[in-house]
Each structure stands twice: as structure tokens, then as C-alpha cells.
Amino acid sequence: MQTTQSSCPGSPPDTEDGWEPILCRGEINFGGSGKKRGKFVKVPSSVAPSVLFELLLTEWHLPAPNLVVSLVGEERPLAMKSWLRDVLRKGLVKAAQSTGAWILTSALHVGLARHVGQAVRDHSLASTSTKIRVVAIGMASLDRILHRQLLDGVHQKEDTPIHYPADEGNIQGPLCPLDSNLSHFILVESGALGSGNDGLTELQLSLEKHISQQRTGYGGTSCIQIPVLCLLVNGDPNTLERISRAVEQAAPWLILAGSGGIADVLAALVSQPHLLVPQVAEKQFREKFPSECFSWEAIVHWTELLQNIAAHPHLLTVYDFEQEGSEDLDTVILKALVKACKSHSQEAQDYLDELKLAVAWDRVDIAKSEIFNGDVEWKSCDLEEVMTDALVSNKPDFVRLFVDSGADMAEFLTYGRLQQLYHSVSPKSLLFELLQRKHEEGRLTLAGLGAQQARELPIGLPAFSLHEVSRVLKDFLHDACRGFYQDGRRMEERGPPKRPAGQKWLPDLSRKSEDPWRDLFLWAVLQNRYEMATYFWAMGREGVAAALAACKIIKEMSHLEKEAEVARTMREAKYEQLALDLFSECYGNSEDRAFALLVRRNHSWSRTTCLHLATEADAKAFFAHDGVQAFLTKIWWGDMATGTPILRLLGAFTCPALIYTNLISFSEDAPQRMDLEDLQEPDSLDMEKSFLCSRGGQLEKLTEAPRAPGDLGPQAAFLLTRWRKFWGAPVTVFLGNVVMYFAFLFLFTYVLLVDFRPPPQGPSGSEVTLYFWVFTLVLEEIRQGFFTDEDTHLVKKFTLYVEDNWNKCDMVAIFLFIVGVTCRMVPSVFEAGRTVLAIDFMVFTLRLIHIFAIHKQLGPKIIIVERMMKDVFFFLFFLSVWLVAYGVTTQALLHPHDGRLEWIFRRVLYRPYLQIFGQIPLDEIDEARVNCSLHPLLLESSASCPNLYANWLVILLLVTFLLVTNVLLMNLLIAMFSYTFQVVQGNADMFWKFQRYHLIVEYHGRPALAPPFILLSHLSLVLKQVFRKEAQHKRQHLERDLPDPLDQKIITWETVQKENFLSTMEKRRRDSEGEVLRKTAHRVDLIAKYIGGLREQEKRIKCLESQANYCMLLLSSMTDTLAPGGTYSSSQNCGCRSQPASARDREYLESGLPPSDT
């Protein structure tokens, strides 16, 4: 049995704990089979509420409340209606669970509190989490508790819990047992006020007032005052005193109409203050309490209390669950709190706490209808705190609402606030782990600078800065996030000073973000918040690039978190689909602008193009789009007409003079040069088209000054232009490399088979030519590896070069060629050189497979072969297990005494492998066919005689081995190959288009001439670099900088297309079946509310009719009295009509109904 700490009023007054001198506390064990236990504290009615609240939080370790619901109702046995029982058992407990609320109720097992205790018990039994629990605190006066003597003796047994008998149904007069379903009890002792109930009420009011002045950080980074709501269910007339005093303390009340008792009295009279007279109140009390007899003095006193309560209509919310039961109780509670905060000032600050509460409860519908209904003018600065809460707690609907209501993200998002958002990352998330890793790396770097700096490092939880965020993004996006979250002044300087080791160039945290929507989008993507990220994507610019960047981030994070790889892959597909759909919208509107969108450098993503981002993200579906393929086809053919027959190209190869004939069709010449003033204002469609359709060097030629007339004649310009157009097209470069590579393989074959002479006769002339040819291949590989991108470090260039599998193949082929040539020059290892070169020829020949990628049918087969090789690699693990198991066993059975290593290797690995294909050595297994020798001289070169002792076991193992390998494992391999083929072949078109892009990009960047003539192209590149001439005209086909006016025009056009796409998506969502059903249900709710309003209007109209009828009756009586000749008649009828008239008058005053005419 668990012990407890108890203290009583005998302790010294200077105890450290604030409540020690005045509080007695302990534990209660309730009898019965449930083994329930609760904590209690005995307090005087004069105890400070702060001490009691501190005890609840500090000693009892209750979670700080986000809401306090004080339940007020009947403390006598009562019959509970079914709907009211559901409201208490389901609605109240659900609201407390979802909002983290405390329920203050009576501690006695009687009346309303009994049903609340049963609801708490049912929830505790059904809940599977210890973190989600309902906190119900029972408060009662000690004078009303049954078996009080057990509690009075708590100070005598400090270390043992009190055993309370399980007689919950035993009610002896005013005494009632404690409710065993509750876990915490506050028992109030009678004080100087005399009555225990008066002391209890005083303590309840003071505790509620104190809690309402405390603050909590629920739902975000800000603090709000803890809202306290009193819920009135049923109740007796004495409850009016508590309600009146509570509303004077500005405590909001929710009154459940239809629950009976004083709640129905308030529901009937509080909305009609003109009827709050003693006669009408007496009528209501008699109807609601028919078995009670009240004095006129009590009725008058209660009427005064009703008038005081009705004077605070903004604190009273009447709700009838029978007629308006479509809303949950937490919704009604939030509406009551919002209503209580409304004032005549209409200042936004008066609604902030309720708005924060709506954010914490995720009730955007209430925020729209009750707070953002047009009555309050919200400024952007008013919404900054709640915007932070909505972002941290992942409430995209609220973020959208705040932006629509006037929040300015450009003013809101400073670098300091962005850093604060990254500080709020969940410690269990992958992003937190990555940021912590980068933070630790930075601490180690700083610690290595010196002991003094190491002592200055912060201690405690890591406070991530934007430097760590930029490093994480750098790992995911590489060059696409270059310069993110760094000092802008440093980035703008030309040739900045070298940064000291460990020093961070961070932006000023008070500066506003340069692109707030992009930064918030990245923050949401890194936390895998798709809905939030989608909204930021919709609000930002450069949508295609942003979606592809998110696709890349999700792909990288899925590799780091294998458990959530499937979910992240689905998110990745969604982002890729966003980019694909938006580009489809753009391509359908304008092809030229869509092509420019693919190759323009995006300023928000470090001047990276959409094609580069798609390549990094491995977005195969994006490359398979018709618009992207049309652009690639345009790049592939260059300035030649698409669809030119290959034979004509080969004819131009053999006879270059055919280039200047009409054999091959070329595009029209570039437009005439224009003035710089015209280029700065590309407003006309013709000017824009000339920009978008211009290619590479032509764009620069548009801006060049006119040449001197004698520089080049028109004929020479025509010849030079045609020559460049033909030899500069990627298709020509590809065909040239294919033809020359076949020539290289033919020369290699000739040298190996015919003209490969040993020294000193060799090498021959053809072999020297082969050496020179390979030398030009080496130069081209060096150019591809180290001279492709000037803005990248050499190490990274080499890393990117090695990542390509075909480049690895080239490196192996060149390495083997160098080794083979070196060996063949030495006579002693000439044959070894021949062997290496023969193997190298096989590697060079396999390099031809790369050429097939351009073919639509053969291209996907390359991927199939590559994936099948991976399948074979894993299959070999299974096969090797059986090979080794069977080989070692048979070797031990047949040749136990043969220790020759070469023979052991043959029999353990080689022979079982051959047996898979049917080569079974019967001469070793069958005794009649054994052919061996036992002579020691012959044993060295021949097989040893097998041991036939376990011949039957060897045969059995052979049968088992063949069954498993030939039937089971081979069929497994075939099934794996079949699955791989189906997966790739099912998406063959997408895989081929993705391969086609890589091939086009590769040959687009290659020099025009093929090896060995490529040496001329390399010399030309070197000369252009020496004389500082632009040697990268072709790069502008895939990466282009547009003039600022045209660039802004493209950005605006893309934004418009994104809005069109989003409107189309929204229309599809509205037309979906689920949305139609939701709208129908919403309309039904509106109709129900409207009908409920009609009922209220009907009641008011009846009331007005009754008043009008009564006025007409009085006027008629006055007319009859004052009319001539009516005195006698009136006096004659005075005795018989005066009393009935008075009765009718009182009946009207009580019920509001007109008197009968009969």
C-alpha cells in the first residue's frame, strides 16, 4: 500500500512549503473491488486560493489547465434526461480531454456530480494513454460528508491511506458519501462564516477568480489567461446567489436550457428583462419546483438576484441541446467565452485571448463566425502572436484566415522570427536530429579554435541558428540554396574577405525576410507538413521550381528515415504532381513562355533552373511531360528542322559541302540587331517572342553593336553560320561520336588481333594511332570532370563526375588501358599487357550500351539490365549459402584426406556451381565408375580416390541441392527478373524520356568534333579562355538570364497560371461527392438554426400580442368606466367583477397570457 505525506495544523508557521501550516492532506482508498485511490486535502474556507492552486500543480502534479469548467447544479437525487446524460458523459468529458481542461464539481456521490463521476470513470477505463486524462476535482464541505470521522483522524495516521467504505448509494439525510470515481478532493472546513456551504461557495469563487488571472502557454509560444467557465445544469434557487456573485466577477456562464431547475428559469427570463418582476418569477418557480413552497420574501430576493444576473447579458449564454444539438459542447463553450469578451470598444486586443483559445482548439469556424465577422478591424501587428501560434501548432486554416484578414507576411517574418520557428521543431522529428547534428559539428569547430572560445559556448539545449538551417538545406538542395540565410551585404560584395574558421556570417535577426513565402515553405516541407506547405507554395512565386525543390528535400529525407520512407515517398509524388500540373497549365497557355520557364534562372533558388532542380529530384514524371520533351527535341536538333532523316546527316558527314545546299533544312536566320533601348522594354509580343525564341549566342548578338561594314561579307557570314548550326547541334555531335567510336573499336580490334607486336618490333603505327586516340578520350574525360562549371569547387566537380555510372566505366577502361600499355612495353610482362588490353577492349565495347539510350525501345532495356544485375547480386547471397553448404559437406564425405588447396577450391565452389547446369561427376559418386589412383607420385596431378563410405548420403545431398538450386532458387530468380521487367516496362516511356534528357544534356555540352579530332575543339576552348572570350554559348540553351522586365513578366505570368490551376483544383474539390455531402449537412444545420430562431421570434410575438391584448382590455375597462351612464352599471357590477378582474390581471402578470373573454 502506498504511503502518503500528511501534515496538519500543528506544524510550525515558518515551514518552507506555503501550505504546510494550514493544510491537511493524504490519500483515500475506496473499498470494493475496484481498488480506487484518490488524494484529498482539508482546507479552511479562508485559505488563500494561490496556496491551493500551487498545491494542485506542485504537489499533486496536475497538468496546468488550459480551461476550467466549474460545474454548478443540483446536489440532490434527480432524474436525468437521456440527452443531458449524453451531454455530461460524452460532451463534457470530450471537451475536457480535447482542450486540457479541469472540471470543478461536487465531491459528493449524489445529483449532478454523480453522473460526471461516472463519465470520468468510463473515460479512464476506455483510455489507453496515460498522457490523455480528464482532471476532475471534487469540492465539498466537510459538514455534508458521510463518515467524516475517518477524515478528521488523518493527522493520527500520517503514513497510511484512509480506507473509505464503499457505500456510495447510502444517503443519510444531508450527509452523502464521497464519489469514488474522482481522484482529487478539496474538503472545506467550516469557518467563521458559520455555514459550510457558504464557506465552500466563497472558496469556489475565490479559486475561480485566481485561476482566471493565471496564464498558460497552451497551443503555441504565447501566453493566454486561463479561461474559466461556469456550467449551470439544473440547480435550486439558492444557486442564484452563487451566479450573481460570479457574474459580478465577470465569470462567463453557460446555461443548459431544458435541464430543469433554475437553469430553465434563467433560460426563460434572462432574455426578457421586462418580465423580471416578482409575480412572473413566482410563476416560474412554482412551475420548475412544484413540490416546494417559497415565501414571498424569498421570491422578491431571488427576483433581485435575477435582475442583477440579467444586467450582464454578455456573460450569459443559453443553449438548448434538444433544439440546437448539432454542435459539440466544446464549440458551445468557446462561443460562450467569445461572447463574454465582447465589449463596446471593439478593440482587437480584447479578442486576442479568445482568438488564441480558438487557435489552440483548432476551431477556425468559430473564429470566422464570432471573431472575424467584420465587427473588429484587425491590423497586421495584432495578428503576429497568434500567427506564430498557428504556425507552430500546424493550423494551416488559421494561417489562411489570418492572411485573408490582413496579416502581412512580409512584415511578420523577420529572420529572428524564422529562427524562432525552427527552435519550435519537435525533438522527435528528423529535422531536429539534423539540426542538432549540425549544431554539434559547429560546437566542435569552435571548440578547436581555443580554450577561451570553448568556454564561451552555450550550455543546455541547442539553440539552433539559421546557420545550421542553411547547412541542412545545403545537404539537400546543394547549389539551389546557395547563400540562404547569410549576411546579404557580404553576398553582394565582390571578392569578399576570407571567412575565419568557425565564424558565421548570419543575417541581422531584425531584418525582414527577402522571400517570406519561400522561407515558410521550406520550413513546412522540412517538417513534412504537406497542407501547410501547399498553402505557402500557392502564395509564393516560382511555383514549378518550389515544388521540384520540395520533391528533392522529401526524397533526401526519405533516405535518412527508412521507417517513414513510404509516407515521404507519397509526399514526394504529390509535390512532383504539383510541379507537373502547374507546368501543364503554363504549357497549355504559351509554349514559348513555358520553354523559357524551364531554363530561366530562378532568383529565389540561387539562380538554379527548373531543369536542374528536376534532375536533382529525379523527377521522371516531370521529364516525361510533353512540353519538356518538346523543348528537349528543340535542343536536340538545334537550328536544323526536326525530323531530318539520318541518312542526310550522314551524307553531310561524308561531304560537308552538302551543308550549304537544301539537303538539310535550317531555321531562319536570327532577327536583326536591335537597340538597347528596345531591349529594355520588351512589351510587344514580337519583341518578347524574339527573346524567348532566341538561342544562346543569338541572344547576345541581339545586344552587340553593329559590326563595321568591312568585317565580314554576307557570303562569309552565311558560310560560318551554316557551319556552326550543323556541327553545333547535339544530334550531329551524337552521330559524330557514334561513328568515330565504332571506328575506334575497329582500330582497337585490328591492333589486338593483327598488329600487336612485342618489343622491339612494336608498337606499330596503328597502335600508336590507338594510343593517341585514347589520349584524346582522356582529355575529354578531364574536361567533363573539371572544366564544366566555373562556380563549383574541384572536389565537388570530381564527386559529381564519379556519381555517373558511365563515367566510372570510362575511368576503369582508361585505367586498364594505361596498365596494359605499360605492361606491353616491358618484354617480361608483354603477355600480361595483352591480357589486360583484351579485357579493356571488352569494357570499351560495353560502353556502347550507353548509345542505345536514345532509342525508344532499347533505352528502357538498359534500365532493365541494370536492375536485373542488382537482383542477381542479392540472389548470389542465397546461392552462395547453398553452394558453400553443399560443397564443404561433399568434400568432407568424399575426400576427407585430400588437403590440396586448388582441389579443395574446385570441389567446394567450382564443382557445385557446374552441377547446377547439369555437369554431374558420376565417376566420383558411382563406385563402378571410379577412375583414380592411390600412387603418391600420381596423386599430385590427378584426382584422389573418393571415400565411398557415405556414398548414399552424397547422392541424397546431390538430389536436395539440385532440387533447391535448379527448381527453387532459379524460379525465384526468374520471378525477380519478371517483376523488374514488369515494373520498368510498365513505365518504359517515362524511363526512356528521362534517359533521353540526360543523353541530350550530355551531348549538348560536348564539343562539336569527336575524338580524335576533339583535340581541335579543346585547343579552341583554351584559346577562348586565354583571350577571355565567352566559350559557353551553348550553356544558355539550358540556363538563361532574362532581362529584368521580361523576367518579371514571366514570373507574373506563372503566378497567374498557378491561380488558374488552383481555381480549377478548388472547383474539382467542390464538385466532389464528399464536399457535396458536407455542404448539404452544413445547410441542414443552418436550416435547423433558422427554425430555432423562428421559435424564439414566435415566442416574442406571442408576448407582444399578450401585452397588446392586455392594454386593449385596460383601455376598454377605462372607456366603460368613463362613458356616460356607465357609473351605475359599473357600481352595480363592482362586487362581482372586481375580484375576477384582479385575478386575471395577476394571471397575466404571471404568465403573460391575455385574460379570457368568457
UniProtKB/Swiss-Prot annotation:
Ca(2+)-activated cation channel. Displays voltage dependence modulation. Regulated by PI(4,5)P2 levels. PI(4,5)P 2 reverses the Ca(2+) -induced desensitization of channels. Inhibited by flufenamic acid with an IC(50) of 24.5 uM and spermine with an IC(50) of 37 uM. Is a highly temperature-sensitive, heat activated channel showing a steep increase of inward currents at temperatures between 15 and 35 degrees Celsius. Heat activation is due to a shift of the voltage-dependent activation curve to negative potentials. The channel is blocked by extracellular acidification. Multiple phosphorylation sites regulate the Gq/ TRPM5 modulation axis, with the Ser-129 playing a substantial role in this positive modulation. Changing residue 831 to Q: Reduces sensitivity to block by extracellular acidification. Sensitivity to block by low extracellular pH is nearly abolished. A motif (Selectivity filter) lies at residues 917-919. Strongly expressed in liver, heart, testis, brain and kidney. Detected in fetal liver, kidney, spleen, brain, heart and lung, and in adult skin, eyes, spleen, stomach, small intestine, colon, lung, bladder, pancreas and thymus. Biallelically expressed at all stages and tissues examined. Also expressed in subsets of taste receptor cells of the tongue, in olfactory sensory neurons of the main olfactory epithelium and in the vomeronasal organ. It is found in: Cell membrane. GO terms for molecular function: calcium ion binding; calcium-activated cation channel activity; identical protein binding; potassium channel activity; sodium channel activity. It is a multi-pass membrane protein. GO terms for biological process: monoatomic ion transmembrane transport; positive regulation of insulin secretion involved in cellular response to glucose stimulus. Changing residue 935 to N: Reduces sensitivity to block by extracellular acidification. Sensitivity to block by low extracellular pH is nearly abolished. The chain crosses the membrane at residues 730-754, 765-784, 806-824, 832-854, 864-893, 951-985. Monovalent cation-selective ion channel activated by intracellular Ca(2+) in a voltage- and temperature-dependent manner. Mediates the transport of Na(+), K(+) and Cs(+) ions equally well. Activated directly by increase in intracellular Ca(2+), but is impermeable to it. The activation mechanism of TRPM5 involves a multistep process. This is Transient receptor potential cation channel subfamily M member 5. It comes from Mus musculus (Mouse). The lineage of its organism: Eukaryota, Metazoa, Chordata, Craniata, Vertebrata. The gene is Trpm5.
